[in-house]
């Protein structure tokens, strides 16, 4: 009987952890603008990505910077979602970066898993991030929260 209780308890804990992980996957987390505004110049500069670092132009409204790896299946799904959004809304850009080729940026932004997507404003400042596979709903919510005027203005 005690073994059965232990097995049931372990299954309950594993299920709870799995549901928690799934709920967090791909969810948008905004960067607090008051922290950036009050940060020293060198820290604020670290939260900005330039066209040279990206190797591509910034979107007029927002840019999704997706950090991926070659063997990452969720990265391909996230790429498809973001590419579709960019094709549907003017002023958006999507840049995919291989983590192996951009270790400096991986360290700078604390990328711990792929895919991780940073959302940049029109000036290249990181305004939010999504860790894990991103679906359309989470990507649209990120734009709504970060773009002046929301998605309808994009």
Cite the ranges covered by each PLM segment.
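Non-catalytic, surface beta->alpha helical segment in thiol-disulfide oxidoreductase systems
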Residues: 119-154
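Short active-site neighborhood of thiol/selenol oxidoreductases, capturing the structured segment around
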Residues: 58-69
């Amino acid at each position: 009987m005690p073994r059965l209780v232990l097995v049931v308890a372990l299954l309950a804990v594993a299920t709870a952890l799995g549901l928690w992980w799934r709920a967090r996957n791909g969810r948008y987390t905004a960067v607090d603008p008051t922290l950036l505004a009050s940060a020293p110049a060198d820290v604020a500069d670290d939260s900005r990505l330039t066209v040279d670092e990206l190797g591509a132009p910034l979107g007029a409204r927002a840019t999704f910077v997706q950090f991926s790896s070659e063997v990452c299946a969720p990265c391909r799904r996230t790429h498809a979602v973001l590419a579709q959004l960019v094709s549907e809304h003017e002023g958006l850009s999507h840049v995919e970066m291989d983590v192996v080729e951009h270790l400096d940026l991986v360290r700078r932004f604390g990328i711990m898993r792929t895919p991780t997507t940073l959302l940049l404003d029109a000036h290249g400042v990181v305004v939010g991030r999504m860790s894990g596979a991103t679906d359309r709903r989470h990507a649209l919510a990120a734009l709504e929260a970060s773009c002046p005027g929301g998605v309808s203005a994009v």
